[in-house]
A protein has these predicted regions:
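DNA-dependent DNA polymerase catalytic subunits
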Residues: 1-195
Length: 195
């Protein structure tokens, strides 16, 4: 069996997550190719997407081992800053909002009730017309519902712990590949709060 193979892309270097099909590759000209990582997904809150883009930009500027060490330090700083801002309630509701599309009418969700559906039902209770195809914006809050539509939310209700978990899941894939432990960074962030 003879097959012709072509080179599709040449990476200066790549960072692989432990999960399949999740990686970040830096092309020769510095562009960064991100595949399957949480920080790139549409429904990730804007605050985390922005921090993820900062991280990607820093990795795109690596040309040497010294640059790589500097990028690791910057990434650690980016994650610590996000963590601190979450703890201090410095993000706006818009920065924390998830936006997920309703793929079917509300009444068609029978077995499970995803978070965006819970938020959509709260909007409907307030008199809003909700249809399949609509993007539902919500934030994670303390309390039994666990979510609140963005329009009804108050910054004091935000469940900071849930957002810390989201921060971890967004960055941990890349941090692991870079040899950085998430809990280590958070330990530094907590110690820094004393100074």
């Amino acid at each position: 069996l003879k097959m012709g193979l072509d080179v599709d892309k040449v990476y200066r270097y790549a960072v692989f997550s432990s999960r399949k099909k999740n990686y970040l590759g830096v092309l020769e000209e510095g562009a960064v190719d991100v595949k399957g990582l949480t920080g790139k997904k549409r429904n990730t809150p804007e605050s985390l997407k922005k921090a993820f883009r900062e991280m990607v930009q820093g990795l795109g500027q690596v040309h040497s081992p010294r640059d790589f060490d500097e990028a690791r330090r910057r990434i650690r700083d980016i994650v610590q800053t996000c963590y601190r801002r979450l703890e201090r309630h410095e993000y706006s509701l818009e920065d924390l909002a998830f936006g997920i599309e309703l793929t079917k009418d509300l009444d068609e969700y029978k077995k499970t009730t995803p978070q965006h559906v819970k938020a959509a039902k709260q909007l409907r209770e307030e008199g809003a017309e909700i249809k399949a195809g609509q993007i539902i914006y919500f934030v994670k809050v303390k309390g039994p519902a666990g979510v609140r539509p963005l329009k009804q939310a108050n910054v004091n209700e935000i469940d900071v712990e849930k957002y810390k978990d989201q921060l971890k899941s967004t960055f941990e894939q890349v941090l692991d590949a870079l040899g950085i432990e998430f809990h280590e960074i958070m330990g530094y962030a907590r110690l820094d709060a004393f100074y």
